[in-house]
Amino acid sequence: MENAQNDMAHFHLPGLFEFHELYRAFLPLFREHREYFYSWCDIGSIYGAPADCVWGGGRLGFGDNDPREVLTLMQEYGISARLTFSNSLLREEHLSDKTCNRLCALFNETGGNGVIVHSDLLLEYLKGHYPNLYFVSSTTKVLTDSRQFLDEVNREDFRYVVPDFRLNKDFEKLNALTNAQKDKVEFLCNECCWFDCTDRKKCYENVSRKNLGESCEDHHCTAPGGNEGYRFSKAMTNPGFISAQDIRNIYLHMGFSNFKIEGRGLGSALILEFLLFFLTKPEYQIHVREAIYLDSMLDLF
């Protein structure tokens, strides 16, 4: 067991394309008013995919912002841009998709950008065609077995591996990892999915089929409260939830430094709440709200 304490948490945020306008407002604030935000955290990457990407997975992408504008914003603030191409059902004929290849070629130009992948077929293709990209093993693999998770961490193909959220509190096994292994682990902090769900893979496969344009019924969640959709208050009670205080007081001390926030399929108001909860000091949250949207004339009803 190695325990080199980390001093900085790197957050990996949702909505590269989906919430481009929100980040255009938030990132200048994050740079110019660092006193608003925790000194022990930064933004490691922002991930996502535009609408109608065959290689997409996890969630149905949306957002029609120009990819060059999206990438330029990330470069301006020194943030890695990640394409979420985690479709688990890709076949050989899908590898020639022009839209996805153009995006990879663009992100490959500057270096420092990555792709979140599930399919080994796609991984090998990307390694051969876009050598400047790094790769993240997607949480859509639903790695709940600690042995499988360790095998994935040990794969040289991946810079980061996102385990299933149900491994988040398996501290005995997590603490047994080497420092090099800990550096590759990226915890999913705010999952709302039922902790005992057995249909998680089926849910992700349904999204993969939709991105491929296949005709299929929607996946109907049968978990308790599944009809309520995502609620942050509910996610906070999930046994796998990792709070900002957990990160600062537990995970950094254990030697972990990478933390993923989900939410590509949600609304921008909820994404802002995540940014407030995880990155912003409580006494400055009102300042961030006022800078982003809140003024004296705003009506809710």
PLM feature segments, named:
Residues 1-152, 158-301:
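Active-site pocket-lining/capping segments in soluble small-molecule metabolic enzymes
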